[in-house]
Amino acid sequence: MEGREVTGCSFRVPRYATVHLEGTSCQRVWPYGKHLFMQFDDRIVHTHLKMEGTWAIHYVGDRWRRPAHSARVVLALANRPRDIELVGHWLGLVEVFGLDDYYESIADLGPDILLPRWDREEAVRRISMRPGRSIGAALLDQGNVAGIGNEYRAEACFIAGVHPAARVEDIDYEHVLDVARRIMWANKDSPIRVTTGVRRAGETTYVFGRNNAPCRRCGTLIQKGFLGGVDAGGDEGELERVIWWCPVCQPAPVGSNRGQPGWR
């Protein structure tokens, strides 16, 4: 994308319907946590997939693989022999603003866990400010750490041997954070997420999506429940998500009933 001229532009959200980027050039494309930023001369397009969004790339004129009514952003870029078209479907967030507003747009986010030189100390500090909170909720909160989603949360907790409902103050939460960073860094350039080291279909995760399947370590059936947590950096309003864990490898916190399926 970088260096290509915009030859067509359509923002299909009311607030930005009159924005035109034709004639500008793409200067830079970069992620911050779960957010994607694209700079076109002196303006930035900011998007977030949330739960349903996706980006598709086509040649201009080709049939889209997803329905037209789901498109929120359409950008045509100069290319030979045919221009290419980027289509953002079902995007949960779309913004356009000037360069000076970039830092304000990420002000509520914690350090990006996938930056080469990320601010681990700041992430640790933010998590430690709420010691009574569950580690599962703390990891998912983008105000603590930007970038961790539900799959990596579940897998990091399993690999670290920590129940997702365990309180921050009762565990080595820095170790869990380091595990999350390590498995995410290992997957950052891969089209397939793998935490087990095995790329075969159905064998890529330890607990995520494996309810009632045997634990890959001890054979105990993986359990599934719900864990509350506010994702301040993008998934506003989604206060709980499904979580998976092994009741043997990740024992429930003492005095809780959170080792039972369906706990909330």
Model segments located where?
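Structured catalytic/nucleic-acid-binding cores of DNA maintenance enzymes
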Residues: 1-264
